[in-house]
From Swiss-Prot:
GO biological process, one term: regulation of microtubule polymerization or depolymerization
Record organism: Mus musculus (Mouse)
Protein's UniProt name: Stathmin domain-containing protein 1
Lipoprotein among keywords: yes
Residue intervals of the SLD domain: 121-248
InterPro entries (alphabetical): Stathmin_fam, Stathmin_sf
Length: 279
């Protein structure tokens, strides 16, 4: 109960607020409107309209009929993300707070589980858990699928050169000995050359055994040898007759003089020119 003006205000507010209606009532009203519009249309007007407009009208009628049924979902329904945004944007509805809906909780796989799966599949080889000091691992390669090819000729040549370049201690010692022998031979050759150039040749022992009739002068190379008169006599007798005959006493005296001169020359040569005095 109350005063008159207060009752009037309440009646006006109630008349303004529309009462909630159910979906099937709205759908039935829409069907009635569509059917009435179809009845009002004449066949002449339908012929005047183009075909695509008629098809669009039919599709709209079908959508309206489907949407009028209770519990139906329209084709152009919003995506779940949009609906979740709408729900989140309206945190308070009917006096209750709506919490944001999280996706279904799912556990992340552990690394140990992933490793076990890979080991079972054979992608990763299993490792021994016990480790020891000085433990070695052999890596084996299966060569049954593809046979190993021979290296090209160029690589073979390089390998041969490398093998030849590797020297041993024996090879080095042999080379050192050969070098020493060469050095000795060179020294001997140099000494021989010096002797032949600087030294005078020594008297041969065969000269002493020769008869005293002929004596050669050793230090005069280009001059002819001195002949005794006895030999000259024999040579002249073969070629031409002698013009004068010498006495035997003269011949003996001449032989003595020549023999003395030859001995003096040999002694001086042997005394002054010796090998020890050279070096």
């Amino acid at each position: 109960m109350g005063c008159g003006p207060s009752q009037q205000k309440e009646d006006q507010s109630q008349s303004r607020i529309p009462s909630p209606r159910k979906g099937w009532e709205e759908g039935s009203k829409a069907d009635v409107r569509v059917t009435s519009s179809k009845e009002n249309c004449s066949p002449q007007t339908e012929a005047a309209w183009p075909k695509h407009t008629i098809d669009n009208a039919k599709s709209l009628d079908q959508q309206a009929q489907i949407g009028s049924l209770p519990g139906t979902i329209p084709e152009n329904s919003p995506t779940p993300s949009k609906t979740s945004r709408r729900i989140n944007s309206d945190p308070v509805a009917n006096g209750l707070t709506n919490k944001p809906q999280l996706p279904e909780s799912w556990e992340r796989p552990k690394s140990s589980d992933i490793l076990e799966e890979l080991i079972v599949q054979g992608i990763i080889q299993s490792r021994s858990k016990v480790f020891r000091n000085g433990e070695s691992y052999d890596v084996m390669v299966d060569t049954t699928e593809k046979p190993l090819r021979k290296p090209p000729a160029r690589l073979k040549k390089l390998k041969v050169k490398k093998e030849v370049k590797d020297f041993t201690i024996q090879d080095i010692e042999e080379k050192m000995q050969a070098a020493e022998e060469r050095r000795k031979t060179k020294k001997e050759e140099i000494r021989k050359r010096l002797r032949s150039d600087r030294l005078l040749p020594t008297a041969n022992p065969s000269d002493e055994a020769e008869p005293p009739g002929r004596v050669e002068v050793p230090f005069t190379k280009g001059l002819p040898a001195v002949n005794t008169p006895a030999l000259e006599k024999s040579d002249v007798q073969e070629g031409e007759p002698l013009k004068r005959k010498k006495s035997e006493s003269d011949v003996a005296q001449m032989n003595r003089n020549y023999s003395c001169t030859g001995l003096e020359l040999v002694e001086s040569d042997m005394y002054y020119n010796q090998e020890d005095n050279i070096f």
